[in-house]
Amino acid sequence: MNKKILFIPLVAFLLLAGVFATQLMKNSAGDDPTKLESVLVGKTVPEFRLEDLAEPGKLYDQSIFKGEPLLLNVWATWCPTCYAEHQYLNELAKQGVKIIGLNYKDQRDKATQWLNDLGNPYLISLFDGNGMLGLDLGVYGAPETFLIDANGVIRYRHVGDVNSRNWQETLAPLYEKMLAEAKQ
């Protein structure tokens, strides 16, 4: 009887260890936690009215996403990864990539100073101080970047920083495809 009681915790431990090992193997085999699906892919940007970051009172709505393909970059000064990606966004903007910034759950004065100090890659900088547009977009945190086509439809969501590797491998081909489609 004593041996059976000792055997039960051993079996439970081995089962848990097996589940844990399976999940580790699955993650190491290529499941990328930054590739989060978005229910908004294939849908238009949600309706909103937000102020310009630098010009309080100047309002924008979702119509700013129509006309040409662009990136919507969700960022904040409290986000260390946003700081790491910012220089690369400046480079992309210099190359002609159209980027709109969404300052997410931040302080306006800190965000404005950030852009003054580090450069401003954004055509428009939206201020989402309470995070409502971010919530509507399904943002988990910053940075996140959405590729939006000329019709205002979200085509791709990237979680994490934009850097030369993921730009060249994933984002640039999608952006170039959207540019080609917009010219047709």
From Swiss-Prot:
Disulfide bonds join C79-C82. One of its GO terms (molecular function) is disulfide oxidoreductase activity. GO terms for biological process: cytochrome complex assembly. Residues 1-4 are cytoplasmic. Keywords: Cell inner membrane, Cell membrane, Cytochrome c-type biogenesis, Disulfide bond, Membrane, Redox-active center, Transmembrane, Transmembrane helix. The chain crosses the membrane at residues 5-25. One of its GO terms (cellular component) is outer membrane-bounded periplasmic space. It holds the Pfam family Redoxin. Involved in disulfide bond formation. Catalyzes a late, reductive step in the assembly of periplasmic c-type cytochromes, probably the reduction of disulfide bonds of the apocytochrome c to allow covalent linkage with the heme. Possible subunit of a heme lyase. Belongs to the thioredoxin family. DsbE subfamily. This is Thiol:disulfide interchange protein DsbE. The lineage of its organism: Bacteria, Pseudomonadati, Pseudomonadota, Gammaproteobacteria, Vibrionales.
